Amino acid sequence: MVCRALVVTLAIGAAALPAATQAYDIKAKTPETAFSGKQRPDILGISADSTADSARATLDSFFKGRSNATSDIQQQKFGNTAVNFISALNFSLPAGPGQNGEVLSSSFSSPASGNRLYFFARNLTFAKEQQPAKADMVREVMGKYGAPTIVGDQHLYYIYRAGSIVSVGTKYKEATAIEAIGKPLDPKAALKLNGETIRGSCVAVVKRAQTKEKVLAAMLSEAKGANCDGVLSVQLIPGTAPDRVGIAQFSLLDVKRVISAAAIDNDAMAAEQSERNASPKGSAPKL
């Protein structure tokens, strides 16, 4: 009798559960991206094509067997539904004698926009005895990503518009990039990069993105004001000697995706809320 009462109670309880706890069907839309065709830069194989699940698999494999590595898998709910999704992945490995330190962080849109990557950063701290030559690092970067848009202030910047890397006139070869990286950014090149637009500099946008909260709402205003579709920034911070690299910081920001995914996610959230708060559709009975 007690068992029967329990079953009845559970059945009634399940029927009375609010909509937030029941399955919700999300019809995903693919957000736009700054990167297309062959122009799809990646960091450790993670690119704008990556979803939270595929990025997590890549990072799990990368850190496999490293006992002192830590991970922080951040999840959140989609609106007031019971749907959980990964919004951010953070992995770290402390630097030590003979061991390089790693900090990797990535941010993803909601399932409504495919749970896609829009920001990824890798900070690599080299052990003192393993600090590479700055010239070698510049060659490695250019060998992987091609000629940058602008070089200076210890950075190589790749600015993307309309699916391609922007050129401001200077055609960087390895030798000219190695020479320019330790100098201030060329103001003439910066002016050419901005052109006649009054929109914000993508160099400034990616720098601020590195320090602010990595959620779409916090990044949207800057993204809408940026004069590019995407940025790849590589910073090579000097190490124990000026010609050595102590820290290498890689940042990939898909500006176009921030704008597109935010619009898709906001529309989906509004639709979910409207559905949840829909007025009853019953009609008065005949009397």
Regions inferred by a protein language model and the residue ranges of each:
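N-terminal secretory signal peptides that target proteins for export/translocation
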Residues: M1-C3
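Bacterial N-terminal signal peptides
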Residues: A5-A16
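Sparse, context-dependent recognition of short Cys/His-centered cofactor- or disulfide-binding micro-motifs
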Residues: L6, A28-P31, R40, L93, ...
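Non-cytosolic coordination micro-motifs
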Residues: Q22-Q74, A121-L287
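Mid-chain, structured segments of secreted extracytoplasmic proteins
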Residues: N68-F126
